[in-house]
């Protein structure tokens, strides 16, 4: 994604692989001026995540729940920042997650054959290669009730 916004700040990915950010910087989530070789970005509640061309990940901002502890991630294809957690899709179709796990939103270690991910406020959703969807996390409003979904692109 070339732009990402949440809460009170906005992040943009430039064509040259650098990143710009404006807005609330209370947690340092806009401190992206030194990022290079970025191919994707995602803004979380108080943190920003960037995917580098080499499959590694960078993050800045709120560390209170370890949602920025992505520095050892490798072979990442996509990233998504949630409220207080961060999710990464690996090239092999598995998923990694760090951060607040109060509602099991980071319990993605057993996911396989995933082709897309999205981190919600307190939940995480994954699209599988066969068009089905998996979800974990807070489900008070049924936001994780996707087990019957098929043919999703």
Regions found by a protein language model. Give the residues of each.
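Surface loop/turn motifs at the tips and blade-to-blade linkers of beta-strand repeat domains
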Residues: 32-34, 70-72, 108-110, 146-147
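Tandem repeat domain/solenoid detector
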Residues: 1-2, 15-18, 36-40, 53-58, ...
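Low-complexity/repetitive intrinsically disordered segments
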Residues: 1-3, 13, 151-153
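Acidic glycine-/aspartate-rich tracts in secreted/extracellular proteins
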Residues: 25-26, 63-64, 101-102, 131-132, ...
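Beta-rich catalytic cores
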Residues: 6-7, 37, 44-45, 75, ...
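Conserved core positions of repeat-based scaffolds
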Residues: 9-12, 21, 47-50, 59, ...
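Blade-level signature of beta-propeller repeat domains, shared across WD40, Kelch, NHL, RCC1
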Residues: 136-153
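Intrinsically disordered, low-complexity repeat/linker tracts enriched for polar/charged residues
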Residues: 9, 29, 47, 65-67, ...
């Amino acid at each position: 994604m070339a732009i990402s916004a949440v809460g009170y700040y906005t992040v943009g990915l430039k064509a040259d692989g650098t990143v710009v950010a404006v807005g609330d910087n209370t947690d340092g989530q806009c401190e992206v001026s030194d990022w290079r070789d970025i191919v994707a970005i995602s803004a979380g509640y108080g943190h920003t995540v960037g995917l580098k061309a080499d499959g590694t990940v960078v993050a800045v901002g709120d560390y209170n729940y370890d949602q920025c502890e992505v520095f050892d991630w490798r072979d990442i294809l996509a990233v998504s920042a949630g409220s207080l957690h961060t999710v990464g899709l690996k090239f092999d179709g598995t998923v990694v997650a760090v951060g607040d796990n109060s509602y099991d939103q980071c319990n993605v270690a057993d996911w396989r054959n995933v082709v897309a991910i999205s981190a919600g406020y307190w939940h995480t959703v994954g699209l599988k290669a066969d068009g089905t969807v998996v979800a974990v996390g807070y489900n008070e409003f049924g936001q994780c009730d996707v087990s019957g979904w098929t043919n999703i692109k």
